[in-house]
């Protein structure tokens, strides 16, 4: 396990209900060579399944989403592990190295196969806490006292006790984990959330919710 700083997510912190500036990444790693393989994709996914089921999660709620990973001069196939729409872990199978003119293209860069191949997993501790509590935002799950204190100091009601507001916030957090905001606008995301809970997009107008949280 290691603490991580997420500078790429700074603009989303506090807005999405699911992003943090720092988090604790739990993991297991395997360094395989062509001469000696310890384990690779099948066992990595099986270990993840066993963990999720051992924690009591519904197997029908688990989705593995393929999305190639690249960074630091290496790359490889990866699986984003989603439970109920919330990403809990990423399983990276790093077997490529950046090479000019390489035959494999990932995210605009050229790669070739490496002699070794590495299992590099990451399990977000705070995400697991959030999933276990079922709270509308990750902040309510891991900083409940702080959220209440800030709300008191700001003189606002903590409207997550309102069932409608809590459901809308929860749907937003779940769908935000599955929607690429580089491809979809906030209006499109709002329309998806409204459709999923059977209300009109107009009811999700930001002005309406600013009034709901006024003192």
Descriptions of predicted regions:
Residues 1-215:
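Structured aminoacyl-transfer and RNA-binding surfaces used for tRNA recognition/handling
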């Amino acid at each position: 396990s290691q603490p991580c700083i997420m500078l790429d997510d700074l603009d989303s912190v506090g807005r999405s209900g699911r992003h943090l500036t720092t988090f604790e990444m739990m993991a297991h790693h395997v360094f395989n060579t062509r001469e000696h393989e310890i384990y690779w994709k099948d066992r990595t996914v099986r270990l993840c399944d066993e963990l999720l089921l051992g924690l009591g999660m519904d197997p029908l709620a688990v989705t593995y989403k393929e999305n190639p990973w690249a960074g630091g001069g290496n790359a490889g196939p990866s699986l984003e592990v989603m439970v109920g729409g919330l990403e809990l872990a990423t399983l990276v199978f790093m077997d490529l190295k950046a090479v000019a003119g390489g035959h494999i293209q990932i995210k605009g860069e050229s790669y070739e196969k490496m002699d070794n191949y590495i299992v590099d997993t990451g399990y977000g501790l705070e995400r697991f806490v959030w999933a276990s509590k079922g709270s509308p935002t990750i902040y309510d799950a891991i900083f409940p006292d702080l959220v209440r204190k800030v709300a008191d100091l700001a003189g606002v009601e903590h409207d997550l006790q309102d069932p409608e507001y809590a459901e809308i916030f929860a749907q937003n957090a779940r769908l935000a984990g599955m929607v690429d905001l580089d491809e979809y606008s906030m209006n499109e995301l709002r329309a998806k959330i409204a459709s999923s809970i059977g209300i009109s997009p107009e009811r999700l107008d930001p002005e309406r919710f600013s009034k709901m949280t006024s003192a």
